Amino acid sequence: MVQLGKLLRVLTLMKFPCCVLEVLLCVLAAAARGQEMYAPHSIRIEGDVTLGGLFPVHAKGPSGVPCGDIKRENGIHRLEAMLYALDQINSDPNLLPNVTLGARILDTCSRDTYALEQSLTFVQALIQKDTSDVRCTNGEPPVFVKPEKVVGVIGASGSSVSIMVANILRLFQIPQISYASTAPELSDDRRYDFFSRVVPPDSFQAQAMVDIVKALGWNYVSTLASEGSYGEKGVESFTQISKEAGGLCIAQSVRIPQERKDRTIDFDRIIKQLLDTPNSRAVVIFANDEDIKQILAAAKRADQVGHFLWVGSDSWGSKINPLHQHEDIAEGAITIQPKRATVEGFDAYFTSRTLENNRRNVWFAEYWEENFNCKLTISGSKKEDTDRKCTGQERIGKDSNYEQEGKVQFVIDAVYAMAHALHHMNKDLCADYRGVCPEMEQAGGKKLLKYIRNVNFNGSAGTPVMFNKNGDAPGRYDIFQYQTTNTTNPGYRLIGQWTDELQLNIEDMQWGKGVREIPPSVCTLPCKPGQRKKTQKGTPCCWTCEPCDGYQYQFDEMTCQHCPYDQRPNENRTGCQNIPIIKLEWHSPWAVIPVFLAMLGIIATIFVMATFIRYNDTPIVRASGRELSYVLLTGIFLCYIITFLMIAKPDVAVCSFRRVFLGLGMCISYAALLTKTNRIYRIFEQGKKSVTAPRLISPTSQLAITSSLISVQLLGVFIWFGVDPPNIIIDYDEHKTMNPEQARGVLKCDITDLQIICSLGYSILLMVTCTVYAIKTRGVPENFNEAKPIGFTMYTTCIVWLAFIPIFFGTAQSAEKLYIQTTTLTISMNLSASVALGMLYMPKVYIIIFHPELNVQKRKRSFKAVVTAATMSSRLSHKPSDRPNGEAKTELCENVDPNSPAAKKKYVSYNNLVI
């Protein structure tokens, strides 16, 4: 079984496919079922919903034995905290009413492989059994006792154990909430997606420790880590954060091996190694209790009392046991631990536990023997180092020392987090059902996980319990210093806290022999490449290293010089190198969006044009003014095409086409729209004066007017070509950032921002003029073709270009100018084209394709009908009305004298008439 567990750990680390792991799980689960026959030690509590629990009840055993001595605080205290929390929840009428929480609690023996074997108990109910071919000796089918279904797991404690268990539980989608695992790698939501924790990850405490070290003025420290995920990942996080923060050097990183032949010799060697850098007095420790105790003992043997300045992680926290008999060597040690509070209710609960009232805890008898150093008369007693008999009348806290273990609060919070998630899940899925409804039973772990990640309640310490997207709790730490001198109560003293930022009371700190002055842990390492030495007066052996900043490089040991204009410092600032040349790439996010929009627009434009050509002689197409419609669609098409020219690699040909087409598409579009709106305006203005049709309203005249307007744009472009021929340049100023590593030379066309605006200026003038005409014709009856759609188009287009101008010029000094301006320009043109296409043509295409019954000739309209409509519109405009637009026609009829000539005209449908 152990070998299979080790094999699974290897396969998990090698990221084997889930199918392979699941096959092995079936084998392991079968073995686990057999294992229960001879290893029955687990706690079972019946309930409607069962939670799993993983606790280090025992320490690691010697070679060949999975479990060792019982762990009174880390094991029994935490286990009883879960039982206490279950009792509290089950007696709370407001939390999970009509639902009883049960439990299946297992011992991990502080070993990841053993914990893996134990945790297979949680997945037995999820493994299908095929018993179709199985018969008992009497010929009857077998009856299997279905194991309880575990919906979530509380635990584990050690990070290495949680990592191993999490790999199994995620395969069966069982959510897991740890109360003590802080390894940073557990924050990887891709690998440990069903893992959450009520304690912050080590990356947070590493940041807190970096802040502490810097606040004390130390810039030269060593690190010490126990071998394993917790220690090594903690130091890795500390090192990474210290590098990012700057001003902090790591003298050396020492690892404490897990398997040691001679503990004394190994730890003496570690102390000697730390003394190789005597100026690095500060030692940052991520280690377990036993390693902390051994390193302090080794420092004492080396007669280094007062030399080392210890900075301990939460594994040290405020524990007394690792410091026993080594208080003098530990004086001044600074430690941190997650902010916590003593749960008074648990103290009352635990100190009242006896052998009689706590039979549900199968390990409590063993704890009793160890705690009171006595031997029970029951069979199976493991206490062999004493002849003192237990009476059963001993009391915890009275006949033995008792102090609440530091993680009790987090165990309770973890159980409550699971309970709150189940409570909200029950309310949502079983609103009108008492207890656990079938929908909740079948919901699965993935749904429960969503509820877990959304919990937010005040925990046992009064602080909010919540999880971020990676399942981590927020970082809140208390900072302690161990003080024994000049104090009436030797021990840990609270000197600060860390919640995203450090609050440290330096005046409350003291060091060896009661010294208040902060001892130093600083010295100067040789300057790195790219730094110059700046010697300090009176200390020639130490100096400050000043980096060559900006575009400087290290000319010699004492001097920095500037690189040439088109160069930047190399990576280590020992010389200069050419600045890379960049352009807007097709795969860049800045280009992908405009290109995507342009491609959609081109497809839509071609579709509209094809539809109009296909139905060229239908009333709707003829009513829209076929000639100008095709001109307008051509302009819209060119507006989309310019996107590709703006993103293409600049050369003389591309730059030439940019100049031609930059404003041409817009010019064609707005010239056609201006001609249309002007024609509508002139017709209705003329209709108010006489029945004579205005001049130049025929299709040929309209095309001639449009061509004349477009020719002005082309003439301006040709003059531009003659005055300033197209060319390409490399602009080093645009991307010459403060950080030379980000400096780039921009390959672009020799076109200034002002030239771009001038090229677009004529088109904008046409757009504004067209908007003016759209406003003037806003009172035209809605059935007179395209006056109002054109108006809406122009209003929207004006908004687009009003937004474009501040963005375009507001980013002129930005390091991302090339990308922002190009993207803004192309998107603005795409949006302008899309607005025109969507408002003017999509409704027509919709009718043509989906409602052909509306695409019919209703009645032709003479100019007299237009005159009549103009007269009616004029009369209507003189009478104020509060009615909505939908009642305009009714009011039009109400305001016409029935005896007037206009009123005697027959009502004419204005649909599909060319205006």
UniProtKB/Swiss-Prot annotation:
It is found in: Cell membrane. Keywords: Cell membrane, Disulfide bond, G-protein coupled receptor, Glycoprotein, Membrane, Phosphoprotein, Receptor, Sensory transduction, Signal, Transducer, Transmembrane, Transmembrane helix. CDD domains: 7tmC_mGluR7 (cd15451), PBP1_mGluR_groupIII (cd06376). Glycans are attached at residues 98, 458, 486, 572. It holds the Pfam family 7tm_3. Residues 616-627, 676-702, 776-788, 851-915 are cytoplasmic. The modification Phosphoserine is found at residue 900. It is a multi-pass membrane protein. Residues 874-895 are annotated as: Disordered. GO terms for cellular component: glutamatergic synapse; presynaptic active zone membrane; presynaptic membrane; receptor complex. Residues 1-34 form the signal peptide. Residues 879-892 have a biased composition (Basic and acidic residues). Residues 35-590, 649-654, 724-753, 811-825 are extracellular. L-glutamate binds at residues 159, 180-182, 230, 314, 407. GO terms for molecular function: calcium channel regulator activity; glutamate receptor activity; group III metabotropic glutamate receptor activity; PDZ domain binding; protein dimerization activity; voltage-gated calcium channel activity. The chain crosses the membrane at residues 591-615, 628-648, 655-675, 703-723, 754-775, 789-810, 826-850. Disulfide bonds join 67-109, 249-541, 374-390, 430-437, 523-542, 527-545, 548-560, 563-576. Belongs to the G-protein coupled receptor 3 family. Homodimer. Interacts with PICK1. This is Metabotropic glutamate receptor 7. The lineage of its organism: Eukaryota, Metazoa, Chordata, Craniata, Vertebrata. The gene is Grm7.
